[in-house]
Amino acid sequence: MIELLSDRAALERISADDITSLTDRATAATFYAGALTPEQVEANRKVVRIAAETALGACANEHQLFTAAFVDGRFAGYVISTVHAADDRELDWLMVDPEFHGSDVSGALMRAGMEWLGLDRPMWLNVIQHNERAIRFYQKHGFEVDHDAVIEKIVPHFIMRRAPGSEVL
């Protein structure tokens, strides 16, 4: 059974080190492709270094929601959702421990983040271009790659957008 807890309730069960460790495992499984430059590898490592601070900051920010998933009491993943402006809503971080890939942890976190952002509002996310599994997952939740959007990242990313009321497969 998946248990979802948000903000302070989640932080009562996990530490900053737990967030960092889970992010390290999640990125190791999904962020790396064979041809990354040293700068790209370092950019991916930075994600791990800033994960706990970012999550703790989200818990203290009324425009963000940190939601953690637990399976049988074990920390399995998290999502950070951010409202930048009324129609600028971002599914900011979605990290799932590789041990729980293929379970509904990612789906439960995705639904929680999207519901908090408002299914009747447009939303977006960014995804590493070579992470085809994640792209397919986001497409199942109504997101489509915006090929006109440009994002300046060391590791190439796509912006994916979801129109209000888009169907979930």
Q: What are these language model-derived features?
A:
Residues 163-169:
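Generic C-terminal helix-cap and adjacent flexible tail
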Residues 138, 143:
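Conserved active-site tyrosine of GNAT-family acetyltransferases
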Residues 2-101, 110-112, 116, 151, ...:
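Acetyl-CoA-dependent GNAT
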Residues 115-123:
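Short glycine/proline-enriched coil/turn segments at helix->beta-strand junctions
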